UniProtKB/Swiss-Prot annotation:
The protein's assembly and partners: Homodimer.
Co-factor note (free text): Binds 1 Mg(2+) ion per monomer.
A single BP term in Gene Ontology: selenocysteine biosynthetic process
Annotated source species: Campylobacter jejuni (strain RM1221)
Enzyme class: transferase
Keyword Transferase: yes
Active site, per annotation: 17
Residues holding Mg(2+): 48, 88, 224
Name used for this protein in its record: Selenide, water dikinase
Length: 340
């Protein structure tokens, strides 16, 4: 579908996953949620999706994600929002069954054709991972938002948690960073066409294939990088026995991201993420803001044994996935995250 400038980002305060509430604030209000033996995922660790056991051989994987427009083309926005929502199921090592549309529609500024194209974009992405859109719900809203409620399935003993990395593992990141920076440049009408095309390709790419490849190498943990930025999601992958050593020079960024960053085109969400992570990295400064950039439809973080990591990386690269080993899991250190 050809990209159309339909001014979607003009009518929203914040774009994509940069509109998420501060992660620190959320932790203080979610401690009332109840546990049950059938709930296999950990409520307290911000898992990517819930895993609920139905039978000895079946667990349902459920997630919900919606975002404000991050691009100005309705079809592309729908596809990106769908890829972003589906990613949570892939990060759990699960298979998507179906999805429901969630729509808040700004009838004052957009006509119904915008909604039609948006839903078409989402439907195409859901079909790409062999699943179905089976319905949804719409309301009128002062700002446009869209996402999916996604249901998947997995064997109860085979889902991949986000905080079970093993000492000695390598951490593979499967997409470059920078969508928050580039989308901020787009909203400021300063993003050139080449960089827009690169950003679109990155965000519309499903994490489905990367997840399928990773599962062949028995990862010890997985997550995806979205609104809390790389450092924020690595924080969620920590446990009491480990720290992460990040190889900063190995991290890939979308073309143009560093230039726009140096121009000051930085989303407010990056500063929120910086505050959230500062307690773990005392010497963290604004030069590291790129590592806090809120991603929309970002890549997977795959924790995998060092022995398997290079072969896994090669398989990902063979599928044109821009993957890199960006960190190593080490014994617990004074600082939980070390940037080298």
């Amino acid at each position: 579908m050809q990209y159309k400038n339909q001014n979607l980002t003009h009518f929203v305060k914040a774009a994509g996953u940069a509109a998420k509430l501060s992660p620190g604030g959320l932790k203080t209000i979610l401690n009332f949620m109840q546990k049950t033996p059938a709930l296999l995922s950990d409520i307290g660790n911000n898992e990517d999706a819930s895993v609920y056991q139905i039978s000895r051989d079946l667990a349902l994987v459920q997630t919900l994600d919606f975002i404000t427009p991050i691009v100005d083309s309705a079809y592309h926005f729908g596809a990106i929002a769908a890829a972003n929502a589906l990613s949570d199921v892939f990060a759990m090592g699960a298979e998507v069954i179906n999805a429901l549309n969630i729509v808040g529609f700004d009838t004052c500024n957009h006509d119904v054709n915008i909604l039609k194209e948006l839903l078409e974009g989402a439907n195409d992405k859901v079909q790409e991972c062999n699943a179905l859109v089976v319905g949804g719900h719409t309301i009128e809203s002062t700002e446009l938002f869209f996402g999916l409620s996604v249901t998947g399935k997995v064997h109860p003993s085979k889902f991949i948690a986000n905080n079970t990395s093993k000492i000695g593992d390598c951490i593979i990141l499967t997409k470059p960073l920078g969508t928050g920076i580039l989308s901020t440049a787009l909203k400021a009408q300063m993003l050139n066409q080449k960089h827009l095309d690169i950003m679109l390709k990155n965000m519309m790419e499903l994490n489905y294939k990367a997840s399928q490849i990773a599962l062949k190498f028995h990862p010890s943990a997985m997550s995806d990088v979205t609104g809390f930025g790389l450092l924020g999601h690595l924080k969620e992958m920590l446990n009491k026995n480990i720290s992460f050593e990040i190889f900063q020079n190995e991290i890939l960024f979308l073309e143009g991201a560093k230039e726009y960053f140096n121009m000051g085109l930085i989303p407010a969400g990056a500063y929120k993420n910086l505050e959230f992570i500062k307690e773990l990295i005392p010497d963290l400064n604004e030069e590291k803001l790129l590592l806090c950039d809120p991603q929309t439809s970002g890549g997977l973080l795959i924790s995998i044994s060092e022995k398997e990591s290079l072969e896994c990386l090669k398989k990902l690269e063979d599928e044109n996935i821009q993957a890199k080993i960006i960190a190593k899991v080490v014994n617990k250190q004074e600082n939980d995250i070390i940037i080298s």
